[in-house]
Amino acid sequence: MGWKPFRFYLQKKDSDQKFIGRIGNNAISKYYLKGIDQKYQSEVKNIFNNNYFWEITLTNNEVIKSKSIIFTCPFPQLKILAKKYLNKKILNLKIDMEPNITTMIAVKNQKDIPISSIKFNDDILAWVAYENSKKRFRSSVGLWTIQSTVKWAKKKINIYKINNKVENLLISKFINFTGIKKNKIIFKKTHGWKYSYNSKGSPYKSYWDRKTRIGVCADWFIGSKVESAWLSANDLAKKILRFK
């Protein structure tokens, strides 16, 4: 039985102009947050509206008082935290949040290649992105993002942290398809999102209750693309300003 090589064909396509943050994908958000108090790595335990302001209790029992509250979290988490204060039209939405598993790797001594991303027709590997193509930095190290298919992620999302086979299989698929040598990989890290995105969208772009001043914006309102999050946030901002 002879060996049958795998082939894939590259095709360059012209597309609309794209914009990305120079330092990172969240560079624009960080710019607009300058001068505003921020708190990170703080999990919200519960929220309460006392008819005057919001009381936001963190898991360390710290209470933050705020005139308004805006959620950007996945739909299942939103319902747990804010069910008491949301309109039924939001609570009754049929939102199917889908998972993904992503592995980041660094490849030493890699020459620059004219590729930004590759999509695969595979049951496990959905696509890979060549991060160096964004021209944010100069490096002899090739940085790649490897993302699984939704179907496979649904099977593995609850075990990827404790089972190294999940990460190893994603990397193995990447190596087989690209020809990059395993011994060239000097860094690898895998992360999963159980509620990554909603590919079907919803009838709404955002939600704002001007009486209680609770708002919701998220990509799952609109679709699975990165810009869906911005479009939802922009729509919420317009609603807040309209009813200010």
Regions found by a protein language model. Name each.
Residues 134-140, 187-216, 220-222:
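FAD-binding beta-loop-beta segment adjacent to the flavin cofactor pocket
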Residues 63-116, 180:
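Central helical "cap/lid" subdomain
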Residues 208, 213, 218-242:
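A conserved FAD-binding loop/helix module that cradles the flavin
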Residues 138-143, 148-194:
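Flavin-binding catalytic cores
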Residues 40-55:
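A conserved short coil-to-beta-strand element within the FAD-binding core of flavoproteins
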Residues 1-6:
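N-terminal FAD cofactor-binding segment of flavoenzymes
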Residues 59-61:
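Glycine-centered tight beta-turn/hairpin loop motif at sheet-sheet or coil-to-beta transitions
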